[in-house]
Amino acid sequence: MSKNPPDLSGGEVKAKQIRFDSDARSALQEGVDQMAEAVKVTLGPKGRNVVLEKSFGAPTITKDGVTVAKEIELEERLPNIGAQVLKEAASKTNDDAGDGTTTATVLAQSVINAGMKSVTSGANPMDVKRGITAAAEEVVTHLRNQSDPVEGKDRISQVATISANNDDAIGDLIADAFERVGQDGVITVEEARGIETYLDVVEGMQFDRGYLSPYFVTDSEEMEAVLEDAYILIYDDEVGNMQDLLPILEKVSQTSNPLLIIAEDVEGEALATLVVNKMRGTLKVSAVKAPGFGDRRQSMLEDIAVLTGGTVISEEKGYRLENATLDYLGQADRVTIDQDNTTIVGGEGSEEEIEARVNQIRQQIANSTSDYDQEKLQERLAKLAGGVAVLNVGAATEPEMKAQKALVEDALSATRAAVDEGVLPGGGVAYLRALESIEEVEVENEDQEIGVSIVREALEAPLRQIAENTGHEGSIVVQKVKDGEGDFGFNARTEEYGDLLDQGVLDPTKVTRSALENAASVGGMLLTTEAVIADLEDEDDDDGGGGGGGGMPAGGAGGMGGMGGMGGMM
């Protein structure tokens, strides 16, 4: 017989286990500790490696905290809930700031463990949480006030180097990328085909549409069509009838300038005539399809028009192709078209109009709630205001490639965060210097004061862990740094004390702030948890193990129920 109770429809309801009060919190704490112990060994420049088994392919060796956290799923259901909640704090920090997952994990573990002790001793969980929240808010305000703006290539390189586990080469490459494409540019990370790590920069506007016919090629070795001082015709419909295109072609041919046609499509008679004119040398011309789809296509055509000083010829707006004049056309110093991409360099659009368009897109990014829309808008912004840089990461082996790529992505995200909100002295020093700000927190009772003390203790945890990963006694290092002032701290890379800002040991303010905010949030949430409900643990019983058909349904149903429960957890 099944152990699960029947529901009214004749099926089975999966039985649940329920834990209350201290039993619930201790089960969650067990999972938090297992997660934190695996992640926090990666903290700092001398953090240790973690090896991750993969179901296929080679194992991954990494020092990236979020990569370790994402791999963790515990066997026991209740502790696993605690681990997943802590994972959420780490992931949220990574989403917000692009780095700081390990710091958030260390802070959260300290808050949770100290909080659990106080609640078990009889403190009011809600008041403890209020104290934690008040103290964290005060520290965040202090961090923002102490933040130092990041300006100049050298400072950007320092931040990127720290985030890349002190790899100077990666730090310099990221700084070069920011210098080349600017803050609004798009910087992506790709796997290189060889062992070298290098930077590719596409200046100007590039979109993923190639020539419509190979007969448009002007450089047969590179298989590219290169148009110098080109006119650009931007049309939001298909071109099939050559008669519509003929008037503007005649006007362009009189100038001897080449022409790029960007349209929804160019086909049939129109395409054939363009190819013939190109082959005869009558007109230097090339044609490509418009980038994007739907409303996004229209927006991208408008971007091209603003960049080149042209007009989108659209019958919806009263413009007809057969009536087009040279004033409708955009212009650019150089257009390069290959089989897959078109690049426009030196568009002759008005700087004022380009700036207005850039500000409009920035506003759309700020108002958008969709990550996908924000990403696409950021790409458009980069093509107008900056450019696109690609960091190609090379390595000798696949595991090294994966680890190196994750490292570069982390460093890039942290550098963006630093450019956004500035930097603070690294190595956990910023948290220690913020201890004085907690003294100003006003509390209403003793339990809230306990919450403030919990944050006070947690602020020491990152430096303590960095020191221990380096092989030093954490308490001694923390006390020596507390005895110092300002940017004085412990440089874990050199294992010496000194002015960390002067030594280039920096942390982005956004990372430092987000790590504390998310740690305080998840800590307060777990402290105020009074019940946990989860599926029962899977049991190895003999109900489904007997021979014959009778055992099969019972065993199958039990197995499926267990899988369903795990699905709900993930």
UniProtKB/Swiss-Prot annotation:
The keyword Cytoplasm belongs to this UniProt entry's keyword annotation: yes
Biased composition (Gly residues): 545-570
GO CC annotation, single: cytoplasm
Main location: cytoplasm
Binding residues annotated for ATP, in chain numbering: T42, L43, G44, P45, K63, D99, G100, T101, T102, T103, G427, D507
UniProt-listed Gene3D superfamilies: GroEL, GroEL-like equatorial domain, TCP-1-like chaperonin intermediate domain
Superkingdom to which the source organism belongs: Bacteria
GO MF terms held by the record: ATP binding; ATP-dependent protein folding chaperone; isomerase activity; unfolded protein binding
Keywords, sorted A to Z: ATP-binding, Chaperone, Cytoplasm, Isomerase, Nucleotide-binding
Coiled-coil region(s): none
Entry EC no(s): 5.6.1.7
Reactions mediated catalytically: ATP + H2O + a folded polypeptide = ADP + phosphate + an unfolded polypeptide
Compartment(s) of residence: Cytoplasm
Cytoplasm keyword on record: yes
Enzyme class per UniProt: isomerase
Region annotated Disordered, chain positions: 537-570
GO BP, sorted A to Z: protein refolding
Function: Together with its co-chaperonin GroES, plays an essential role in assisting protein folding. The GroEL-GroES system forms a nano-cage that allows encapsulation of the non-native substrate proteins and provides a physical environment optimized to promote and accelerate protein folding.
Family statement: Belongs to the chaperonin (HSP60) family.
NCBIfam families to which the protein is assigned, alphabetical: GroEL (TIGR02348), PRK00013.1 (NF000592), PRK12849.1 (NF009487), PRK12850.1 (NF009488), PRK12851.1 (NF009489)
Subunit and partners: Forms a cylinder of 14 subunits composed of two heptameric rings stacked back-to-back. Interacts with the co-chaperonin GroES.
Name the record gives this protein: Chaperonin GroEL 1
